Curated annotation (Swiss-Prot):
<feature type="binding site">
    <location>
        <begin position="132"/>
        <end position="133"/>
    </location>
    <ligand>
        <name>NAD(+)</name>
    </ligand>
</feature>
<keyword id="KW-0057">Aromatic amino acid biosynthesis</keyword>
<feature type="binding site">
    <location>
        <begin position="108"/>
        <end position="112"/>
    </location>
    <ligand>
        <name>NAD(+)</name>
    </ligand>
</feature>
<dbReference type="GO" id="GO:0000166">
    <property type="term" value="F:nucleotide binding"/>
</dbReference>
<keyword id="KW-0456">Lyase</keyword>
<comment type="function">
    <text>Catalyzes the conversion of 3-deoxy-D-arabino-heptulosonate 7-phosphate (DAHP) to dehydroquinate (DHQ).</text>
</comment>
<feature type="binding site">
    <location>
        <position position="250"/>
    </location>
    <ligand>
        <name>Zn(2+)</name>
    </ligand>
</feature>
<feature type="binding site">
    <location>
        <position position="145"/>
    </location>
    <ligand>
        <name>NAD(+)</name>
    </ligand>
</feature>
<keyword id="KW-0862">Zinc</keyword>
<feature type="binding site">
    <location>
        <position position="154"/>
    </location>
    <ligand>
        <name>NAD(+)</name>
    </ligand>
</feature>
<dbReference type="Pfam" id="PF01761">
    <property type="entry name" value="DHQ_synthase"/>
</dbReference>
<dbReference type="GO" id="GO:0003856">
    <property type="term" value="F:3-dehydroquinate synthase activity"/>
</dbReference>
<keyword id="KW-0547">Nucleotide-binding</keyword>
<feature type="binding site">
    <location>
        <begin position="172"/>
        <end position="175"/>
    </location>
    <ligand>
        <name>NAD(+)</name>
    </ligand>
</feature>
<keyword id="KW-0028">Amino-acid biosynthesis</keyword>
<dbReference type="GO" id="GO:0009423">
    <property type="term" value="P:chorismate biosynthetic process"/>
</dbReference>
<keyword id="KW-0170">Cobalt</keyword>
């Protein structure tokens, strides 16, 4: 299978995204091109490590690197300052210097936490993303957002720190649990809804192939998602404008995650719920049609994702939403779809109106 290569153009911080099958063994060559130093720390977790870390370490060693492996616990509940400190401890004891490299091997939690460690250790060291979940491959591994959660909210502590490269091997999706795989499809849908109507139609036409994890279909879908993400990041790296569109579905999504303790509902499942709420809100405010909302809901359901908000009272949702990064002095910014393939960011002051439209607290 051909390797698809995309370029994220950010001046001196530009980097390549490589997407393909059976390419994880090229990580040594990728890292050799990325840094002058020859010490690497591979940050992975206790689930991904036994599956792929040995091959990554072997490739890095063959490329001339001295490799330190750091395994962290698996799960969103471990994306914390406690886990981050344990990574710092290993980097310090391992003698990594400013020209050393971190490799993030895993899903979004590993990528976000290892990326934040790279952004802050010795005031910044380079890192490479090797995402092994669909959600991380199409979203969190590209664009330089790194961070950890706080007990009062998700991703409240973080930094922008671009990777030196992103290496996406679709073969790693073969070992991904079904629920996590389906959660990743929510982020795939997101790109079609707010950025590319033709891509949304492609997803509608390829539901069976996506559910069957067809490699060719996945390479095509992941490559398109990464191309769209790169286009957005190139124009708005620090999320001062356009990049906020990538938060479609995340306003209610983050609230669902927080209210369920970051464990009962996966991130992708929460985003799926949030996208359907955003579509309902967009229709009510005249930005899209009932037919658009039906198509969005139908695709979410066809790909095995939830659509209904968990039953918490309106005050609970209000408290969490007002701690959201998208909250402003006067209201909350909602990313709404304009039809399918377009978007609009709307500031809404009256959350009671939103709750009534979206069925919050019912």
């Amino acid at each position: 299978m051909t390797i698809e290569t995309l370029r994220v153009e950010l001046g001196e911080r530009s980097y390549d995204i490589r997407v393909g099958s059976a390419i994880i063994g090229t990580i040594g060559a990728v890292c050799r091109d990325a840094v002058a130093g020859r010490r690497v720390a591979v940050v992975t977790n206790t689930t991904v490590g036994p599956l792929y870390a040995d091959g990554v370490v072997d490739s890095l060693t063959a490329a001339g690197f001295t490799v330190l492996r750091i395994d962290i616990p698996d799960g969103e509940e471990h994306k914390t300052s406690v886990t981050l400190t344990s990574v710092y401890d290993e980097l310090i004891k391992g003698g990594l210097t400013r020209d050393s490299l971190l490799v993030a091997l895993g899903g979004g939690v590993v990528g976000d936490l290892a990326g934040y460690a790279a952004a802050t250790y010795l005031r910044g060291v380079p890192f490479v993303q090797v995402p092994t979940t669909l959600l991380a491959q199409v979203d969190s591994s590209v664009g330089g957002k790194t961070g950890i959660n706080h007990p009062l909210g998700k991703n409240l502590i973080g930094a922008f720190h671009q990777p030196r490269a992103v290496l996406i091997d679709v073969d790693t999706l073969a070992t991904l649990p079904q629920r996590e795989y389906l959660g990743g499809l929510a982020e795939v849908i997101k790109y079609g809804v707010v950025l590319d109507g033709k891509f949304f139609a492609f997803l509608e036409q390829n539901v069976s192939a996506l559910l069957g994890r067809d490699r060719q279909t996945l390479v095509r879908a992941i490559t398109r998602c990464c191309a769209l993400k790169a286009w957005v990041v190139e124009q708005d790296e620090r999320e001062t404008g356009l990049r906020a569109v990538l938060n479609y579905g995340h306003t209610f999504g983050h609230a669902v995650e927080a209210l369920t303790g970051y464990t009962a509902v996966l991130h992708g499942e929460a985003v799926a719920i949030g996208m359907v709420r955003a579509a309902v809100l967009a229709e009510a405010r005249g930005h899209s049609s009932a037919g658009d909302t039906r198509r969005i809901r139908a695709l979410v359901e066809a790909l095995g994702l939830p659509t209904e908000l968990p039953s918490f009272d309106a005050d609970s949702y209000r408290d969490v939403l007002l701690r959201d990064k998208k909250a402003r002095d006067r209201g909350l910014d909602f990313v709404l779809n304009r039809g399918i393939g377009g978007h609009e960011i709307v500031r809404i002051e009256n959350l009671s109106e939103v709750f009534g439209i979206c069925g919050v607290g019912e």
